[in-house]
Amino acid sequence: MTTTAISAALLLACANLAQAQFAVPPLPAVEGPISGPGPMYPGLRPEAPGTTPEDFGYITDEYFVSGTVTSGAATPAYKTRILVRRPDPAARFSGMVVSEVMHSNGFAVTFEPARKSVMLRGHVQLEIAGQQSNVNTTIKPFNPDRYASLSIPAGATVTSQIVAQVGMLIKSNLSGGPLAQYPVRRLFLLGTSQASGVLRNYQAQEHFQARMADGSAIVDGYLATSTLGSAKMMVVDVPTVHMPTMTEVNSGGAVSGAPFERPDSDDPANRYRLYEVAGMAHANSRDTPTYTPNPCTLPVANFPWGAMVAMGLSHLVEWADKGIVPPRAAPLEFDNDAANDGSRLALDENGNVKGGVRNTYVDVPVARYGVPNAPGNVLVCAIAGTQFDFDEESLSAHYKNKGNYVSQVNRRLMELIHEGWMLPEYAEDVRSDALGIPIAPPGKR
């Protein structure tokens, strides 16, 4: 048996042992929907007209949940808030709840960019203010009167226990619960960037330790994106889709590949996919208002991060709910030669990375996407991608005219949708991007 096989066997053995020793978490008390006093903290940044939950026929309800957690020898109390974004009428509900713990920046940073697909598919979105900073730094200062009673003890284990208790509340389908008319079939936990660390902590601290009464998992699948650190994702008994970006892969520190990479698996006790998307950085201007206007030294990428994450979520949901096995993708390629082009990643003749999950933006290119944006202490720039648009000469060398370019984009787009690497609901966005590229006819160049 190889070292890799032995390690995998040990991980699975430990997981099976942990699963045999579980407890059913207590249900938290629930208040709500909360109607005041004053405005509700929205949990989302201002959105363009036509893209809000209300525009998709969604209702957002706020609830306060409270209970106790274990912290060392103590059992301190907590009280926090959850937001439930649900389709109206309930007949539109898919049976899927996609949850995430509020990022330390105060927003639901996975749902925010991927919301179009989540809402078109009728999923409920559950936002949990599970970290002490969510309450003390973000929510209470926004409206001290409305949120005066909220309090969360510090600590990652506290957050994990709150997630488990809220998950029990949602999965229990209580007649008086927040989703009384919405029969929940599956619950997923999502996490991006700092919140992906919350997801990892939950897997380690509560996934096997806190279970439903029948011993099944509270969380039915995990989506970790823009993940930090070098640790591999934990082996669990539900599907996991892991989507580190070029930012994490490029800074991974390995001679070949990244230390957090592990083999894809269809084993029922270890369902796992690694999706490294070519062209996608930790952050970009399309989905993050922070970059408008651009505070960075270099142009910030306008890559469709949300569309690619929605693709990963779709595969996760279908794998967990319907048993549809998702496709496998090659990892991003390395040449480990940062001195040559500023990147440890292997780049093609256009300056875009080789390998990974493909898309029209790198396969029918009009720009070069890279990482990092700029060194130094400006975090928002260090995690951003770069985008250098082709000049007129380069565009002319690639495409006969605009029609030729748009035709190539459409052809590749249809292939990607068929292969499962792009969702149909984003096709018009891709086409719109293509139509906006200024490629002049030959006689006018």
Regions found by a protein language model. Give the residues of each.
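Positively charged n-region of N-terminal signal peptides that target proteins for export
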Residues: M1-I6
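N-terminal signal peptide c-region/cleavage motif recognized by signal peptidases
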Residues: A13-A15
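C-terminal His-loop and adjacent cap/lid subdomain of alpha/beta-hydrolase
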Residues: A20-R445
